[in-house]
Regions:
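N-terminal Lys/Arg-rich, disordered targeting/topogenic segments
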Residues: 1-23
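Mature extracytoplasmic or organellar-lumen-exposed domains after removal of signal/transit peptides
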Residues: 29-32, 40-172
Length: 172
């Protein structure tokens, strides 16, 4: 009887040790999940702010100086289009509309802001290509705008090959 009782006690001790090992693993997993959630909350807070505004004229003047050219009619518009598109891609957190993981999927305001910027960029690039790049009624279009405008109309949710960001950068 004592042997059976001793065996039962040993079995109970082994089971308790097994449960404690599982409890340690469970605690570790819970700690990892909590840390991950805290990191994503902090990143979400940092990424949810809109980028700084910029002076359109000052931006055009700086770029004209860097390129060593005299700005012509339409230069400021073109440079601003490029700057707005670059700002959308290079802001804090990058381009979030096609994110599949946290915290990107939690942030709905910034992807909506990005979509608004994208609509403006698409509309202006199309207007530049179709209307402004043609001299009066000539059928020839600017070659760079012929390439850029379709790139900026790429699917805004694509995250695989090719990524949305890479297609937009090619358009810029």
């Amino acid at each position: 009887m004592r042997e059976k009782l001793g065996d039962s006690v040993e079995i109970m001790k082994e089971r308790l040790e097994d449960m404690n090992m599982g409890s340690g693993l469970r605690r570790l997993l819970i700690a990892i999940v909590i840390i991950y959630c805290l990191i994503t909350l902090v990143l979400g807070y940092l990424w949810s702010s809109e980028p700084e505004s910029f002076s359109v004229q000052q931006n055009a003047n700086v770029l004209a100086e860097e390129l060593g050219i005299e700005p012509v009619i339409g230069f400021t518009t073109s440079v601003t289009l490029m700057k707005v598109a670059e700002t959308m891609l290079d802001k804090s957190g990058g381009y979030l509309s096609n994110d599949l993981l946290l915290p990107g999927i939690w942030l709905d305001n910034i992807p909506n802001w990005e979509y608004g910027v994208l609509v403006q960029v698409r509309d202006l690039s199309r207007a530049l290509r179709k209307d402004f790049s043609r001299s009066q009624s000539q059928s020839t279009q600017d070659k760079d705008l012929e390439i850029a405008e379709p790139q900026l109309h790429f699917d805004n949710d694509s995250w695989a090959v090719p990524s949305t960001e890479s297609e937009y950068r090619r358009g810029i």
